[in-house]
Amino acid sequence: LVLACCLGRAGVPCTVLEAATVAPPELRASTFHPPTLDLLDGFGLTAPLLAAGLKAPTWQVRLHETGEAAVFDLGLLADDTRHPYRLQCPQAELVRVAERLALSYPSVRVLRGARVHGLEQHDQSVTVKFDLNGQAQQLACALLVGADGGRSVVRGYVSERFDGETYPETTLLATT
């Protein structure tokens, strides 16, 4: 959606095919770091996130076994960033504000409930095959960007592997 904002601002036609029918409300990530806030600022996305979140002036690394903590004062970065703090704000809020901004551009459309099930590569274009509301659809485009995560459907169709790994879960996160 952030790429859709960038393309929309430039007037480039863009269609986002999103499998989820609604933005997921569950907490996936909750911290935006200074470089991310600086980047999102260029798209007009930081201000609404700041309004919805909580600024945290420090960053901590804690050894749970001993209770020891290293505390980093992010204010020391004030000469290097416009946002010398972390922002505690649910990722779902970024999805919400980015989708709203993307859809404000006439050249952008977001198709929720669109499940990609095939690709055809041509010399100068690619055709994406997907289902939308139970109906088979196709979309011809000059460029396809797969931004669908580690289990990427798009990556699978172009035979790109994900050589990353998943770390074991070692943290309990409680929100109120």
Locations of regions flagged by a protein language model:
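Active-site-adjacent segment of FAD-dependent monooxygenases/related oxidoreductases
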Residues: R28, H33-S104, L111, E120
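Residue-level detector of anion-binding/catalytic polar loops
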Residues: P13-T15, T46, V108-R109, R161
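Conserved dinucleotide-binding and phosphotransfer motif residues
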Residues: L3, A10, S104-P106
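Flavin (primarily FAD) binding-site architecture
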Residues: G146-E160
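Core beta-strand elements of the Rossmann-like FAD/NAD(P) dinucleotide-binding domain
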Residues: G134-L143, A147
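Conserved structural-core and active-site-/substrate-pathway-adjacent residues in large, well-folded domains
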Residues: A4, L40, V95-A98, V145, ...
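A conserved short coil-to-beta-strand element within the FAD-binding core of flavoproteins
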Residues: R112-V126
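Glycine-rich FAD pyrophosphate-binding loop
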Residues: C5-R28
